[in-house]
Amino acid sequence: MKKLILSSLVFACINTSVEALENDGSKPNDLTSPKEASQESQKNEAPKNEVQRNEAQKETPQSNQTPKEMKVKSISYVGLSYMSDMLANEIVKIRVGDIVDSKKIDTAVLALFNQGYFKDVYATFEGGILEFHFDEKARIAGVEIKGYGTEKEKDGLKSQMGIKKGDTFDEQKLEHAKTALKTALEGQGYYGSVVEVRTEKVSEGALLIVFDVNRGDSIYIKQSIYEGSAKLKRRMIESLSANKQRDFMGWMWGLNDGKLRLDQLEYDSMRIQDVYMRRGYLDAHISSPFLKTDFSTHDAKLHYKVKEGIQYRISDILIEIDNPVVPLKTLEKALKVKRKDVFNIEHLRADAQILKTEIADKGYAFAVVKPDLDKDEKNGLVKVIYRIEVGDMVYINDVIISGNQRTSDRIIRRELLLGPKDKYNLTKLRNSENSLRRLGFFSKVKIEEKRVNSSLMDLLVSVEEGRTGQLQFGLGYGSYGGLMLNGSVSERNLFGTGQSMSLYANIATGGGRSYPGMPKGAGRMFAGNLSLTNPRIFDSWYSSTINLYADYRISYQYIQQGGGFGVNVGRMLGNRTHVSLGYNLNVTKLLGFSSPLYNRYYSSVNEVVSPRQCSTPASVIINRLSGGKTPLQPESCSSPGAITTSPEIRGIWDRDYHTPITSSFTLDVSYDNTDDYYFPRNGVIFSSYATMSGLPSSGTLNSWNGLGGNVRNTKVYGKFAAYHHLQKYLLIDLIARFKTQGGYIFRYNTDDYLPLNSTFYMGGVTTVRGFRNGSVTPKDEFGLWLGGDGIFTASTELSYGVLKAAKMRLAWFFDFGFLTFKTPTRGSFFYNAPVTTANFKDYGVIGAGFERATWRASTGLQIEWISPMGPLVLIFPIAFFNQWGDGNGKKCKGLCFNPNMDDYTQHFEFSMGTRF
């Protein structure tokens, strides 16, 4: 039998014929390791001198001939499971029909071995059959960390360890993972941790890696000393540092826990210096930290030496530019830093970025702004100099999108304000990034610039798909709503097309009589809504929405049932402004009023809602009895001397409106330039609409000016929210928010029908917190809830970032709002009383009645959290308003907390799924 074995590292006597090998009686060497291969190669060294080479040539007369056995007839792989034969063929680069070549096979074996999956690889050749033999490494079937953390924390550690399920087992990789785990634990503040590694065989060639962690203790900085500091307080000095002195009750949110973060300690000196430079101390010098640790108590003292120097003010600001593509006056006007200001390094950086933006918006993407300082130490003055190198005009070469596993490229491209061949613009680049974030499709968005040459640039758009679909079910119980079930299916990015769809249903069984005067089963509700929205029809700036809805609910004072449909067409004006026009047809029926007197607001003047009620004086009754006559009923209005106790009450309209039909057109305008969907830090949001039900006319309502309905009015409404991140001013993660809204209902004459459920009510998360949703309302002389013909609310909020990793914030708020209504008598504008004298027929009619207002205010705290279920707000409000008296002689001046005004106040609210 003719046989040749080829090692991965050496081929012995390749020029010796197969016959010579057999005649020599030598046996093929099975070289299975680099060490053995090296030893064998030394034994089979080629002859070193000419005589030896001649003798070798005599012994191998057929060395220049290729025997048939050396031609490859087939290739096979023995013991290979990590990859397919096809992939192995691509790696070895040997094909059937090739002539056996030692170097080629050696290269092939090494290429296979270098894949990292095998302990050893060798090749054999017999009868034209080339076989590669593999001894594969074990696979990692799983990685477990025992003795530390939650599953989320463990996943975070595993990502840092560089070892995961499916990897090949490797001792060096294992040791690296062990070291990385210890380092990660130290980074979290745990020192002296012990990590032991063990392996468990799961199956043949599969191992479970278990890291047993004996977590060390945290070291706390009990005291931080800044020797030489006199002009800044310790808390200010430490404001940017990762390592700070532990506060009293430091475990509470918002306080310094004092944990030692050793991996950040070397950078804290620079952070402290930056704090000083933000306050004008340009000569400040901070020593390297000295840490003294007591491992018996796990307490530490942190010591720095500080040289503060003098505080500098800005004497002058100069701008030097090599190519004045933007006028110097324009650049100077854009700067925030002013002469005579205390120098602030943060403002210097911000102004450098402003100058960069001004130049880059003209297309000069590679412009460089180099700030320089000219100090006058004697007088404590500094001259700020900005040197600008403009560079070449830059155009976009290509836009490369990655990370969108579900969302199609065109959905992303249509939000970008820059495309191939466009002139570069930095502001448009940032707006494009913000526009992608506002979609709410992605959890991460980043646009990077890649330079092609001095005049071309690629834009690399990297996104990470977020949760755009929601399937929610809720179950709860409340004193008002009873057993509550709700469910919704919504998708903001349907099949990756950018379209949105939602199906919503809400059911509440009702909790009975929660408050005096409410109908039995108050709180019972069923509501359903189906909507489909395409925000960009055919990738144009036009959008469309179709929705169907129906509802049945027992409200505070009546039962409402109805339904309808709506269609809407809109258009984007730029990338921030949206305008739409929609049509809506709604049929609503109100019944089951808590008081029959509510019928007067749906009935005609010909219908008696409540008959006249009378009483007979006692003297008349006694006289009739003494005369032997039949006594009259005390409540009879026909008896002689009867006194009217309650007049006859009729409806107020010219016809019956118990089932009104509303046919309306709505014009809507919205604007949004915020930088995030859920947690905006900067920017404004504005939206407004005008709904015209019927056509304006001073005459009687008919089918034409009612647009097919019998409701006629124009309702205008707008809301505005502004956000500003105060971190650059206060050095803490604090967001200031201001939100306001206002609306009014205009009617053309006092006979135009106005539904009670279309007026404005206050109370709840979206208006004035601390009052039950929709429970603040003007009342008529009978105490009936009418709502207002106008509304205005304003809210101020300060939101502090408590846990950045958990996306949790704590906010303080102050809410104020009022509702307007008409009364028959003149009086002061603000009119707070348990019972007002609102005249509903005059609502919204210019010149009819007198405009009054009832106002409320509240303050409190709220916790804001992007939870796994979505945005969640927990609200703890305190309601108050100004009341001059409580009806019992007790006077109140100024702001009165929780007065007795028959308001339904509450001290806890929550909201899910809304923007903050």
Curated annotation (Swiss-Prot):
Protein family membership: Belongs to the BamA family.
The gene coding this protein: bamA
Main localization, broad class: membrane
Annotated PROSITE patterns: POTRA
Subunit (UniProt): Part of the Bam complex.
Stretch forming the signal peptide: 1-20
Keyword terms, alphabetized: Cell outer membrane, Membrane, Repeat, Signal, Transmembrane, Transmembrane beta strand
GO cellular component: cell outer membrane
Protein's cellular compartments: Cell outer membrane
NCBIfam families named in the record: OM_YaeT (TIGR03303)
Bias-annotated ranges (Basic and acidic residues): 42-58
A biological-process GO annotation: membrane assembly
Region (Disordered): 21-70
Record protein name field: Outer membrane protein assembly factor BamA
InterPro entries: Bac_surfAg_D15, BamA/TamA_POTRA, D15-like, OM_assembly_BamA, POTRA
Cross-referenced HAMAP family: OM_assembly_BamA (MF_01430)
Polar residues composition-biased segments: 29-41
Domain POTRA: 70-137, 138-214, 219-309, 312-391, 394-466
Role: Part of the outer membrane protein assembly complex, which is involved in assembly and insertion of beta-barrel proteins into the outer membrane.
